[in-house]
Amino acid sequence: MDINQNLGNLMKEAQKMQQRMQEAQQQLSQLVVSGESGGGMVTIKMNGRHDVTEVKIKPTLMDEDIEMLEDLIAAAVNDAVRKIEKASKEKISQLTAGLNIPTDLMGDKEGE
């Protein structure tokens, strides 16, 4: 292949990737996950845009130490964020599976 053909193929792959990324962003924005802490004492619902849409606190926690409640809320939010990030990575992996993109261009630094 000559360089023009390589560039043409690269542009086609980039266009496919852009379209797939837009589709993935749309799908991920509709995703809703639940993060929890304290064995379900605090539950947070978060969408794919990282917006917290619901907070549930067991009534028995309202009589507890406020610092513990704050810690449980933070832990539940962090749990939800981790779930969103995992779902996002899985979706991106699915999208890039059929494309001829070098893996070092994907910014995956888990192996480092």
From Swiss-Prot:
Keywords: Cytoplasm, DNA-binding. SUPFAM superfamilies: YbaB-like. GO terms for molecular function: DNA binding. The keyword Transcription regulation does not apply. It is found in: Cytoplasm, Nucleoid. GO terms for cellular component: bacterial nucleoid; cytosol. HAMAP family: DNA_YbaB_EbfC (MF_00274). Homodimer. Binds to DNA and alters its conformation. May be involved in regulation of gene expression, nucleoid organization and DNA protection. Belongs to the YbaB/EbfC family. This is Nucleoid-associated protein lpg2755.
